[in-house]
C-alpha cells in the first residue's frame, strides 16, 4: 500500500479488497507553490470551432528575425512584454524595475563567452534554484545544451533584439521566442546572471522559461527534475537517500556516464519544493528584502557606471535567504546540481567523492574535501589537477560520498532514455505516450478510497508482450516504468491553479477479457486487488516508478487523490521490451434491435438524405401508420396508436389531453407539448421534477418531427412518450436517494443502459453540457440528453448510406441538422 513520505504526500490510499478501515485526508505541502485548483480547457476537437475567433498563426523565429532586420527595428515581444505583467501576478509593487537590453547594460555584450558552462549561472533574487540547478547539469551535456540553446545567436551579427530557446512540453519540443529586454535595478540584473558581466545566455534562458510558464513569479519554488525533463524529454526517478540501495554510488556514477542529469537536496521538514519562501513571507516582503540587499551591498549606487565595462566583475549578491543555511555550509530546502563523481587515492585507500554545485555561485560546503580543506595537501598534484580542484568561491565543491549520504535526503535522476539503472548493460527502452484528462463529474473519480467513482477515471490498457533478456534472472518478468505527469499547473498559477496530489494503480486484466477494450466497471475494482501501484500520492508534477510484472495484459488507472479535481495529464510507459499502451475507448454505437415485420418506417426530417432507409432505433408496432400531410389530417381521422378497446387507461388519458390541447389540426407546438408532458409528469410525484422547459420541448419536436412542420401529431407524440417512459425507468434506477437528480458519474451507466455506447470524450462532453454545478443531472436534462443522442444517432445512420461509419455533408445539410435540433 502507498506510504506517507512527507508532509506533502498523501497518506496511504484505501485498502485493497479485504482490508477494511478509512484513511485520513492527505496533508498539503506548505510550499508557496500551492494555490487553488483550476479547470483545464475543453478538448481541442470542440474548441477548434472557435479558432477563427481566437487563433492567429504564430510566426517562427526566423520569420520574426528577418522582419526585424528588414525594418531595422529591435524586437519587442507582444506576448511577454517588458513590463510588470511579465514579472509578478500576485500583487502590484511600488518598486520600478527598469527593463534594459544587454547593449544598454554593458559596452560589449556577448551571448556566450568561451562556451556555456555551469560557472556561468548565478542565482538572482527569485526562488528558482531548482531551475538553475538543472541548467548547471545541462551544461555537462553539450548535445542537449545545443538543442535547448541554439548557438547561432549573437549581439553582433544580425542582432535584432530577438532570441529563441527550445523546451520539451508534454511530448513535443516547442520553440520559445523572446526579446532581450531584462529587468534591472541600479543597472544590475535582478534575476539570473553570469559570472561574466557581459554574458547573457543564462539570463535569457531564464526569461524564455518564465514566458513558457506565464511569468517570472511562476518559477518560484519547484523540483529540479521538472526543469530537467523540460530540457531533455527524459523521465525522472526519485530516491530517498536514507533508504538508498547499497549500490547507490554505482547508480549515480552510471547515470553521470550516460549523460543523465542529477540533482539533490536537503529536506527542511516542510517542503517538497526548493526555493520557496517560508510561511508568511509574501512576494512584497521578498522584493523589499531584495532591494535592501542590493542597496546595502558594498557597491554603492553612486559608484555604479551606468553601462559598465567588460572587465568589471559581476556584482554578485547572495539571494534573499529564505532557505536555511547550516553550520557546515550546506543549505536546507535548496536544490544542488550533482556535477561529477570520482574516486581518489588518499592515505592508502580510495575515497569516493561527489561534486556538487550551489546555483547561488557561492556558499559552499566547508567540511572534508571542501575547497579549503587542509588535507588536500596529502593528495597527489596530478590527482588534484584531474579533479579540477580550485580554491575559488564559485559554488562548486567536492565532498565525500559518506558525507553526501549523511547530509542530503533526496536524489533526483533524469534518465534521458530510461536506461535500467540496476543493470550493468545500457539498454534502450521503448516508450508509449498517452494524453488524458480528468473531468469533474465524469472522469475525475479520485483514488481507490472512493470506490463509487474510482472506476470512472481514465483507463489505459498495457500489454507486456515479451520478457526481459536477463540471463541472471530466471523469472519470466517484464520491466517497465510508468510516469504520470500533470499538465500546465505551473502556467495556470496566476489563475489559482496548484499541483494536484496524483498517483496510479495497475490491475491485471482477466484472461477472458484480454483484447476487450471496454471500460472496466465498478464491480471489477471492488473485487480485484491491484498488482502494482505508485508508492505515494504526492503533489508533484510527475509521479514515476519502476515495476517488474509477468507478461500479460494490465490496466493502468491514473487519478488524483481527491475526486472532482479537473486537469490534463500525460501517461508515459517505458519498457525494456515491446509493449502496447493505449487508452481504453469504447466503440461508439447504438443498440439496433431486429426490425419488426409489417412495420413501416417513420422518416424523420433529418433522415431525408436517405428517405428510403428504415429507422435504426427502437420502434413500437403502433408507430407503423406513417404521417399524412396537414391538409389530409383535417379531412380524415388521425391514425390511432391502437384500437380503443386495447388502449390502456394511460393511452386514453393521453388521447384526451392531446385532443384538448392540439385543436382541430391534431398537432402540438413546443408550448403545447410542454403543457402535455408536464400535465402527465406532474402526476408522477416520485420523479420530484419541476417539469420540462420550453427549450427542452423545442428540442424534442425538432428531433421527432417527420415532415419539418415544427409540430408533433399524436403518433409522433406517442413515440416520444414511449421513449420517455423507458428512460424514466433508467432515471429512477439511478436516483437512489429519490432526490429528483442523478450523480453525473452514474450517467455513463445510464447512457449504456439506454442502448447508447460512447467513448470517454463523449461522456465528458455530456457531463459538461448537462450537469449542474453540483455535478447532478435533473430529469429534464436527463431526457433532453437522451432525445438528442437518439436523434443524432438516427441522423448519422440515415446519412451513412454504405454503413462504413463515415458521412459526408454539404453546408446546407450540416446547418439543417445543427440548427434544427
Curated annotation (Swiss-Prot):
Biased composition (Low complexity): 635-645
Annotated region (Domain IV), positions in chain: 650-821
Protein name: Calpain-3
Enzyme class: hydrolase
Source organism of the structure: Homo sapiens
Span list, region Disordered: 7-37, 609-652
UniProt note on regulation of activity: Activated by micromolar concentrations of calcium and inhibited by calpastatin.
SUPFAM superfamilies: Calpain large subunit, middle domain (domain III), Cysteine proteinases, EF-hand
UniProt KW Cytoplasm keyword: yes
Chief place of localization: cytoplasm
Function: Calcium-regulated non-lysosomal thiol-protease. Proteolytically cleaves CTBP1 at 'His-409'. Mediates, with UTP25, the proteasome-independent degradation of p53/TP53.
Record domain Calpain catalytic: where: 74-417
Effect in UniProt of substituting residue 798 to E: In LGMDR1; uncertain significance
Subunit composition and interactions: Homodimer; via EF-hand domain 4. Interacts with TTN/titin. Interacts with CMYA5; this interaction, which results in CMYA5 proteolysis, may protect CAPN3 from autolysis. Interacts with SIMC1. Interacts with UTP25; the interaction is required for CAPN3 translocation to the nucleolus.
GO biological process: apoptotic process; calcium-dependent self proteolysis; cellular response to calcium ion; cellular response to salt stress; G1 to G0 transition involved in cell differentiation; muscle cell cellular homeostasis; muscle organ development; muscle structure development
Annotated disease: Muscular dystrophy, limb-girdle, autosomal recessive 1: An autosomal recessive degenerative myopathy characterized by progressive symmetrical atrophy and weakness of the proximal limb muscles and elevated serum creatine kinase. The symptoms usually begin during the first two decades of life, and the disease gradually worsens, often resulting in loss of walking ability 10 or 20 years after onset. Muscular dystrophy, limb-girdle, autosomal dominant 4: A form of autosomal dominant limb-girdle muscular dystrophy, a myopathy characterized by proximal and/or distal muscle weakness and atrophy. The age at onset is variable and can range from the first to the sixth decade, although later onset is less common. LGMDD4 is characterized by onset of proximal muscle weakness in young adulthood, gait difficulties, increased serum creatine kinase, myalgia, and back pain. Some patients may have upper limb involvement. Disease severity and expressivity are highly variable.
Residue positions binding Ca(2+) 1: 662, 665, 667, 672
Chemical reaction(s) catalysed: Broad endopeptidase activity
Alphabetized InterPro entries for the sequence: C2_III, Calpain_cysteine_protease, Calpain_domain_III, Calpain_III, Calpain_III_sf, CAPN3/13-like_C_EFh, CAPN3_PEF, EF-hand-dom_pair
Amino acid at each position: 500500500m502507498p506510504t506517507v513520505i512527507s508532509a506533502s504526500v498523501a497518506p496511504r490510499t484505501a485498502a485493497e479488497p479485504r482490508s477494511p478501515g478509512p484513511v485520513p485526508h492527505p496533508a498539503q505541502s506548505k510550499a508557496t507553490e500551492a494555490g487553488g485548483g483550476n479547470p483545464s480547457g475543453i478538448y481541442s476537437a470542440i474548441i477548434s470551432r472557435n479558432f477563427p475567433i481566437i487563433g492567429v498563426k504564430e510566426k517562427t523565429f526566423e520569420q520574426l528575425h528577418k522582419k526585424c532586420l528588414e525594418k531595422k527595428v529591435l524586437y519587442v515581444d507582444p506576448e511577454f512584454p517588458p513590463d510588470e505583467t511579465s514579472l509578478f501576478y500576485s500583487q502590484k509593487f511600488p518598486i520600478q524595475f527598469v527593463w534594459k537590453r544587454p547593449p544598454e547594460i554593458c559596452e560589449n555584450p556577448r551571448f556566450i563567452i568561451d562556451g556555456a558552462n555551469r560557472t556561468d549561472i548565478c542565482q538572482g533574487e527569485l526562488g528558482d534554484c531548482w531551475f538553475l540547478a538543472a541548467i548547471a547539469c545541462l551544461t555537462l551535456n553539450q548535445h542537449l545544451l545545443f538543442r535547448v540553446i541554439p548557438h547561432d545567436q549573437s549581439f553582433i551579427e544580425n542582432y535584432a533584439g530577438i532570441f529563441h530557446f527550445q523546451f520539451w512540453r508534454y511530448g513535443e519540443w516547442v520553440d520559445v521566442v523572446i526579446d532581450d529586454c531584462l529587468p534591472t535595478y541600479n543597472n544590475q540584473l535582478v534575476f539570473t546572471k553570469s559570472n561574466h558581466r557581459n554574458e547573457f545566455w543564462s539570463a535569457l534562458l531564464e526569461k524564455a522559461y518564465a514566458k513558457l510558464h506565464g511569468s517570472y513569479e511562476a518559477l518560484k519554488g519547484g523540483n529540479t527534475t521538472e526543469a530537467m525533463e523540460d530540457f531533455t524529454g527524459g523521465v525522472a526517478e526519485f530516491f530517498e537517500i536514507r533508504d538508498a540501495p547499497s549500490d547507490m554510488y554505482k547508480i549515480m556514477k552510471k547515470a553521470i556516464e550516460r549523460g543523465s542529469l542529477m540533482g539533490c537536496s536537503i529536506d527542511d521538514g516542510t517542503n517538497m519544493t526548493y526555493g520557496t519562501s517560508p510561511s508568511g513571507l509574501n512576494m512584497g516582503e521578498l522584493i523589499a528584502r531584495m532591494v535592501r540587499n542590493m542597496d546595502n551591498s558594498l557597491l554603492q549606487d553612486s559608484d555604479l557606471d551606468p553601462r559598465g565595462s567588460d572587465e568589471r566583475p559581476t556584482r554578485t549578491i547572495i539571494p534573499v535567504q529564505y532557505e536555511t543555511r547550516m553550520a557546515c555550509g550546506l543549505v536546507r530546502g535548496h536544490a544542488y546540481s550533482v556535477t561529477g563523481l570520482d574516486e581518489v587515492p588518499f592515505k592508502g585507500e580510495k575515497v569516493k567523492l561527489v561534486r556538487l554545485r550551489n546555483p547561488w555561485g557561492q556558499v559552499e560546503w566547508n567540511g572534508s574535501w571542501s575547497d579549503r580543506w587542509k588535507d588536500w595537501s596529502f593528495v597527489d598534484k596530478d590527482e588534484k589537477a584531474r579533479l579540477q580542484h580550485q580554491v575559488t568561491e564559485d559554488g562548486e565543491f567536492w565532498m565525500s560520498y559518506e558525507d553526501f549520504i549523511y547530509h542530503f535526503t533526496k536524489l533526483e535522476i533524469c534518465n534521458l532514455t530510461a536506461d535500467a539503472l540496476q543493470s550493468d548493460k545500457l539498454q534502450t527502452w521503448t516508450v508509449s505516450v498517452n494524453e488524458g484528462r480528468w473531468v469533474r463529474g465524469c472522469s475525475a473519480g479520485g483514488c481507490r478510497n472512493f470506490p463509487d467513482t474510482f472506476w470512472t477515471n481514465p483507463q489505459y490498457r498495457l500489454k507486456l508482450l515479451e520478457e526481459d533478456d536477463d540471463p541472471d534472472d530466471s523469472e519470466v518478468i517484464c520491466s517497465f516504468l510508468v510516469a504520470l505527469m500533470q499538465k500546465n499547473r505551473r502556467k495556470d498559477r496566476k489563475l489559482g491553479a496548484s499541483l494536484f496530489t496524483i498517483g496510479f494503480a495497475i490491475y491485471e486484466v482477466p484472461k477472458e477479457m484480454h483484447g476487450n477494450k471496454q471500460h472496466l466497471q465498478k464491480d471489477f475494482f471492488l473485487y480485484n486487488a491491484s498488482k502494482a501501484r505508485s508508492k505515494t500520492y504526492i503533489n508533484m508534477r510527475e509521479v514515476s516508478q519502476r515495476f517488474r510484472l509477468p507478461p500479460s495484459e494490465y490496466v493502468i488507472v491514473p487519478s488524483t487523490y481527491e475526486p472532482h479535481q479537473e486537469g490534463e495529464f500525460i501517461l508515459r510507459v517505458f519498457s525494456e521490451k515491446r509493449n502496447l499502451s493505449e487508452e481504453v475507448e469504447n466503440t461508439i454505437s447504438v443498440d439496433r434491435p431486429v426490425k419488426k415485420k409489417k412495420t413501416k418506417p417513420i422518416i424523420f426530417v433529418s433522415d431525408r438524405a436517405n428517405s428510403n432507409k428504415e429507422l435504426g432505433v427502437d420502434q413500437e408496432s403502433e408507430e407503423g401508420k406513417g404521417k399524412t400531410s396537414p391538409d389530409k389530417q383535417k379531412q380524415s381521422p388521425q391514425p390511432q396508436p391502437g384500437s380503443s378497446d386495447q388502449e390502456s387507461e394511460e393511452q386514453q388519458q393521453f388521447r384526451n389531453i392531446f385532443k384538448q390541447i392540439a385543436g382541430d389540426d391534431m398537432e402540438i407546438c413546443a408550448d403545447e407539448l410542454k403543457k402535455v408532458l408536464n400535465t402527465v409528469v406532474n402526476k408522477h410525484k416520485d420523479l420530484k421534477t419541476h417539469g420540462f422547459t420550453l427549450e427542452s420541448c423545442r428540442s424534442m419536436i425538432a428531433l421527432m418531427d417527420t415532415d419539418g412542420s415544427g409540430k408533433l401529431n399524436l403518433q409522433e407524440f406517442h413515440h416520444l412518450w414511449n421513449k420517455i417512459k423507458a428512460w424514466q425507468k433508467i432515471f429512477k434506477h439511478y436516483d437512489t436517494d429519490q432526490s429528483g437528480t442523478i450523480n453525473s458519474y452514474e450517467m455513463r451507466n445510464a447512457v449504456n443502459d439506454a442502448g447508447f455506447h460512447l467513448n470517454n470524450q463523449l461522456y465528458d462532453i455530456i457531463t459538461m453540457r448537462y450537469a449542474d454545478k453540483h455535478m447532478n443531472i435533473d430529469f429534464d436534462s436527463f431526457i433532453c440528453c437522451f432525445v438528442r443522442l437518439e436523434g443524432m444517432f438516427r441522423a448519422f445512420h440515415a446519412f451513412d448510406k454504405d454503413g462504413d461509419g463515415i458521412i459526408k455533408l454539404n453546408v446546407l445539410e450540416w446547418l439543417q441538422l445543427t440548427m434544427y435540433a
